[in-house]
């Protein structure tokens, strides 16, 4: 259609060379790309899932790893080398091992690139920096490959803390287990920036003989927020010193 219109217009201009040329009123607007992600399940899709908020985790968050905190959910079985839920722990969902449980933190894959498992011992007390958790049982919504065959575990880290605060918490438990956690936030500053963080230390002798754990962790988050923008930059990590329970127990 546009081809024939062009010919007709050309003929008209050729017959009337003195006619006034009308400028094209069309304008071109270049739009930025839009990225759509589908990590979390909702009620209107056929996926079995459980949502847990920070308030749901708080009564159980006494220093144990995230798999142990999820042990009461349907279809979940957890393991602990030391027997106390601290140190090397594992999770199975509907009989599927950790290599088929896709773990994401803020939508970013966290599974080990070689073994496809997740070493929770490197994230001690990470539950203290989690805003919400969603566990999808069975094939889920993850876009990160075949690791979501068995289940998907989505972790959402701390939301923006608008008020300044500092908090020190300590927990004591069996087998000489001690957890100390320091959390803080600057609140929203003049330009919309916020700095928050967490420092944690966990020590436990473990239920199994010679299964002690000495764990340190940090989490720092910087955010910028205004009416239309939210930018987060975060860094976290941990250091673990564990005894020889990794090698199992001798039959004798």
Label the model's feature ranges.
Residues 67, 71-109, 131:
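Extracytoplasmic beta-strand/coil segments of soluble accessory domains associated
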Residues 165, 172-203, 208-247:
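Transmembrane beta-barrel wall of Gram-negative outer-membrane proteins
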Residues 80, 140-144, 170-172, 207-209:
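Outer-membrane beta-barrel domain signature
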Residues 16-59, 98:
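Short, acidic, small-residue-rich periplasmic hinge/interaction motif at the N-terminus
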Residues 9-14:
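Sec/Tat signal peptide C-region and signal peptidase I cleavage site
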Residues 33, 66-69, 89-92, 104, ...:
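N-terminal periplasmic accessory domains that precede
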Residues 27, 76-87, 108, 114, ...:
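Short, glycine-/polar-rich solvent-exposed loops and beta-turns at beta-strand/coil boundaries
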Residues 109-137, 156:
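Short acidic/polar hinge/loop motifs at secondary-structure boundaries
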């Amino acid at each position: 259609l546009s081809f024939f219109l062009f010919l007709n217009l050309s003929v008209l201009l050729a017959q009337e060379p003195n006619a006034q040329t009308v400028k094209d009123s069309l304008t071109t607007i270049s739009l930025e790309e839009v990225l759509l992600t589908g990590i979390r399940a909702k009620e209107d899709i056929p996926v079995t899932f459980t949502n847990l908020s920070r308030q749901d985790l708080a009564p159980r968050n006494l220093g144990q790893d995230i798999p142990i905190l999820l042990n009461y959910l349907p279809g979940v079985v957890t393991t602990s080398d030391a027997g106390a839920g601290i140190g090397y722990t594992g999770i199975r969902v509907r009989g599927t091992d950790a290599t088929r449980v896709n773990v994401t933190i803020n939508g970013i894959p966290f599974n080990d690139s070689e073994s496809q498992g997740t070493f929770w011992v490197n994230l001690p007390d990470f539950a203290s920096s989690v805003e919400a958790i969603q566990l999808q049982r069975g094939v889920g919504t993850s876009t990160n490959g075949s690791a979501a065959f068995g289940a998907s575990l989505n972790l959402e880290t701390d939301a923006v803390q608008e008020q300044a605060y500092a908090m020190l918490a300590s927990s004591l438990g069996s087998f000489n287990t001690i957890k100390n956690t320091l959390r803080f936030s600057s609140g929203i500053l003049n330009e919309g920036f916020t700095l928050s963080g967490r420092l944690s230390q966990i020590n436990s002798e473990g239920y199994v003989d010679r299964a002690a754990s000495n764990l340190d962790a940090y989490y720092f988050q910087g955010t910028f927020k205004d009416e239309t923008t939210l930018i987060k930059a975060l860094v976290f990590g941990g250091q673990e010193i564990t005894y020889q329970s990794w090698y199992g127990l001798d039959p004798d």
